[in-house]
Structure formats: C-alpha cells, structure tokens
Design a protein with these regions (language model features):
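Extracellular/periplasmic carbohydrate-active domains that bind, remodel
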Residues: 1-299
Length: 299
C-alpha cells in the first residue's frame, strides 16, 4: 500500500488476524478516528514507512470540519499503531497527532511483536507508547520524539507489568508538560540511553520511574527540576551512570536491591558521590563499578 490519503477513516488499515507475511505500507497519510494501523499474525518481516496520522485532513473548514470536536475525539479514543503478533517488524518515520495511545503493543491468541522503530513520534497524547506484551527480544526504539499532555495523568511511555520482553530506547526526546516521561512496571529489561527528559509540570513525581525488572539509564539529560529517577520497591537491579541534569541528577531509591550509580552530575562543581546521588539506600547496596555484579544482590 503506497501513496494513499485517508480523509475520515474510523479504522485506517488492518493487517490480520488472518495469517500474513511481508506487508509494506509506505507514504500513507490521513485522519483516523479509532485506529490507524492494526497489525496481527504476521510471521515474516513487514515494513511500515513514512506514515503520518493527523486531524487536520478532516478538521479543515474547507471540508466542513470542526477542529475542536475532531481533536478531542482523537485524543480520547485514537490508537495510532497497534501491534500484536508480528516478527521482525520495521517501523520508520511515523507520526501521530493527537492521540490517546500512539503506539500500543498487545498480545492476541497469535502472539506478540518484536521489531525496531526508528524516527517515530507522537504528540498531543495521553500515552505516546504503551507496552502490554512483546516477545522476549522485544523492541529497539531509536530517534523517537514524544510529547504527552492530554487527559488524566499523561505519561509518554508506560510499560505494564504484563510485559516480559526487553524495551530499549536510544537517542530519544521527551518533552511537553507530561506528568512523567517513562514509567516501567516491566518484569524484564529496560534500557534508556542518550535520551533527553523534561516536563516542568509538577515537582513531585520522578521523570523516570521503575519498580520491577532491571533498568539501565546511561548518558541521559534531565532538563527540568523534578526528581530525575525513582527506583521503586520491587526493582531487581539498576545501573545509573553518566547522566546530567539542569540542577543535577536527583535519584530516589525505595528498593532493597542493588543499584549502581557512577559519574552522574550532582550539582555544579560537585564530584560524583554515591551517598549524594542516591537517597534512601544503604551504602552496601551501591556498586562502585559500572558493571552488573550478581554478588551485589542481597541474599
């Protein structure tokens, strides 16, 4: 499917649940009300490239549209890209505005997804990404841009406790007045590398929070004054290294498991000191190296 505009579709494109392979969707744009692309039961590599969903195709006065009604309906109801079973999916240069959930990863009787997503974006959302279920090797997300501010408790990325696969984000931006940027309840691995985090909406909740599984946060920048990172009760292991912030990197720790904090920016002129970086953690739970050591786990 190529070079198509959808003006006012309720559901845009459905692939599956019948068995299928090697779809290619390229240079498709338009306004979708409930779902943009819904994908399931693809057992050989599919590709989605240069797809943009936006309310302006149908909200224009030239076609008798009403921006306010359409905008509200989409952020309250629309899911831009829904992925169930698909193997080795390639998603490149995609975007949606506005949206309830930009990219939703789910399980069906056919299974779940693994794949890579590069140059993806979601704006005016309640959730940019929600991960309910993925395959163990999971998701590789690179060069993402995520903005959430609509509805109750807007969060850019939410990884639910039903997730048992790896989620890895590299070189991505999070901004706009979201309550939080990333919240992970995942049982598996989460990696955040070379990302930009910000909000400015409130001062209580951490921009990044994890309370399950294992997380790595490396080489990231925290641009606003909220607590940067909350390592919550239930987290199995954390590596936090080489990060900086507008007024330092503020890390709160509520778990009895090990955390490794090294070479993080505390405040202007300060050297890294684990007792300053991590609040509320026993010193024997802090690793002095940047490598995961099983011996650091409590008995």
């Amino acid at each position: 499917m190529e070079n198509v505009t959808l003006i006012n579709s309720y559901n845009g494109i459905r692939i599956g649940p019948e068995p299928n392979v090697r779809h290619r969707i390229r240079s498709v744009v338009g306004c979708v009300l409930r779902r943009g692309i819904w994908l399931d039961n693809c057992t050989d590599i599919g590709r989605i490239e240069n797809v943009q969903w936006h309310c302006h195709w149908w909200s224009s006065p030239k076609v008798g549209g009403d921006w306010e009604k359409l905008y509200k309906y989409m952020w309250q109801n629309c899911e831009g890209f829904v992925f169930a079973r698909t193997d080795w999916e390639y998603v490149t240069n995609t975007f949606i505005f506005p949206v309830k959930i930009g990219y939703h990863f789910i399980a069906t009787k056919n299974g779940t997804m693994n794949g890579q997503l590069c140059g993806i974006g979601a704006d005016a959302s309640n959730r940019c990404i929600v991960v309910d279920a993925i395959q163990p090797m999971g998701l590789l997300i690179t060069n993402g841009q995520f903005v959430a501010f609509e509805g109750e408790n807007p969060i850019e990325i939410l990884i639910n406790p039903t997730c048992e696969g790896s989620v890895r984000l590299q070189n991505s931006d999070f901004w706009g007045p979201a309550i939080q940027n990333v919240v992970s309840h995942s049982k598996s691995f989460v990696s955040l590398s070379n990302c930009y985090f910000s909000s400015g909406r409130q001062k209580e909740k951490a921009l990044v929070e994890a309370d399950n599984g294992k997380i790595q946060i490396e080489g990231c920048s925290f641009a606003t004054a909220e607590p940067s990172i909350l390592l919550g009760n239930g987290l199995k292991h954390a590596i936090v290294t080489g990060n900086n912030g507008d007024k330092g990197v503020k890390i709160a720790f509520a778990s009895d498991r090990s955390v490794q904090a090294e070479a993080n920016h505390l405040k202007d002129g300060a050297q890294n000191d684990d007792s300053q970086v991590v609040s509320g953690v026993r010193q024997d739970r802090i690793a002095r190296t940047a490598n995961h050591q099983d011996s650091l786990q409590p008995e």
